[in-house]
Amino acid sequence: MKPTKEAMNFNTIHDLYSSVGLGDKIDKKCEFSIFNLADIHTEFPYISPVYRSDFFSFLFVKDCDGKLGIDGIVSDAFPCSVYFDNPGHYKNFTWYAIKEVYLITLTES
């Protein structure tokens, strides 16, 4: 879960969702999105690659079992928690089960 030279880089929100097969569900110029990760990740465990994004991310955790890593620091994803990160941070996720987790992404514009 540590940043590496092999980390993926997502310049746009569309790039992020294209990487999980949802590129056709979001406009290429999208600057704001909300998704329930339970609708995206249905097979577990799901382990994301380490990636860097050029947009803000808010993760609203209501009910799940998982871990998240930001810049190599790993923590459990606790129910009733909110996580935030700025553009440029390295991150990744490991999900063992997701019932309700919302990812809100937005650009600086």
Model-inferred region functions:
Residues R52, F84, T105:
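Short aromatic/basic micro-patch
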Residues D63-G69, V82-Y83, K91:
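Short beta-strand segments in beta-sandwich/barrel cores
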Residues G88-S109:
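Ligand-binding loop in jelly-roll beta-barrel domains
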